[in-house]
Amino acid sequence: MDLKPAHVVVPAAHITRDEVGELFERKGISKEIGNHDPTYLTQWARYSLRQEFIEAEAGMTGCNFGVAATGDCVVCTNEGNADMSTSIPKLHIVSMGIDKVVPNYESLAVFQRLLIRSATGQPSVAFTSQFRKARPGGEMHVILVDNGRSDIIANPVHWRTAKCIRCGACMNTCPVYRRSMGYSYSYFIP
C-alpha cells in the first residue's frame, strides 16, 4: 500500500479496515488470515510496533506545542506511540515548527482544548505528554524548524496563516475535502 496521507490529524482516514487487514497479512503482522476486526488488528499493530520501539536506538516525535516559559515540549496523541518513542530509546529527537511555541501554561491550556475539540471532537485526548529534558541516562535534542515561517510571520498580508495549529477543522468542514480526502489538492496539509 503506497498511499499519501489524507488528513493532517488522521492520516489513514481513507483506508478501510479490510485494506489494513490485507496489508497486515502481506507483511506477516497478523496471524489470522481474513480477520479484519479493528480490535484484533489494533492488538497486532501494538505488538509489532512494540518490538520496533524496543529495538530502536532513537525515537523521534513531533511537538504540538512548545512552552516558552518552561521549555516543555507537549505532544498530544490517542495511541501513546509518542510515549514509546520517548521512554524506550536512549535518544529522543523532537522536531517542532517555530510557530508551535506558546508563551506559558495558561496559553497552552487554551490551545490544547482548541486543538483536541477541533481535530476530533473529543473533550480530551488519551495521552498528553510533556518533555523538558531527557530521561535518566538518555539524550534529548529539540530541532526548531523555521522553513520560511519567520518570513510569513513578518509579512503583513500572510502573518495570519502562522496561527494555524494544524487541527484539521477546516478540512473537516470543507465539502471538497470531505469527498476527496485531500487528493484534489497538491498537498494534504492546509
Question: How should each PLM-predicted stretch be described?
Answer:
Residues 1-154:
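Iron-sulfur-associated redox domains of electron-transfer enzymes in respiratory
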Residues 135-161, 177-190:
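Ferredoxin-type iron-sulfur electron-transfer modules in oxidoreductases and energy-metabolism complexes
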Residues 114-117, 176-180:
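Short, well-ordered loop/turn and helix-capping segments at boundaries between secondary-structure elements
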